[in-house]
From Swiss-Prot:
Protein name, per record: Ribosome maturation factor RimP
GO cellular component terms, A-Z: cytosol
HAMAP family, alphabetized: RimP
InterPro entries documented for this protein: Ribosome_maturation_RimP (IPR003728), RimP_C (IPR028998), RimP_C_sf (IPR036847), RimP_N (IPR028989), RimP_N_sf (IPR035956)
Entry's transmembrane regions: none
GO biological process: ribosomal small subunit assembly; translation
Function: Required for maturation of 30S ribosomal subunits.
Amino acid sequence: MGKKVVDITAELVKPILEQLDLELYDVEFKKEGKDWFLRVFIDSETGVDLEDCGKVSERLSEKLDETDPIEQAYFLEVSSPGAERPLKREKDLLRSIGKNVHVTLYEPIDGEKALEGELTEFDGETLTIEIKIKTRKKTVTIPYAKVASARLAVVF
């Protein structure tokens, strides 16, 4: 059921996003406690603000009311993917070159299963991350197939 709702929502929201020069980042349909949440994450090259989220929410809500694809009651949330957004697609990694990332691996590289540093390169096959170890820097090349998950990392 959840997969179908996600697909239908993605189809409904894409034309709305195109009109506003925004793009779909992700859609989730999850039950938390007793409540269902339909979460639509939007993005653009220049970022997303509250006004963008409001416009998309209002227009998508109208489309969902018209088509009524969801049987149960739910809460609709439209937001940006956030500062520590997951990097799920190759496009997300390419856009994140030069930024700090946190990468979790399926198997350790140099004894580490998680690495954090600046993503300096991504070619579709490998990621290159520059990590800091005390006062020196080390470059680590990671096969993309070994990446379990990746996200942006906020540095303080």
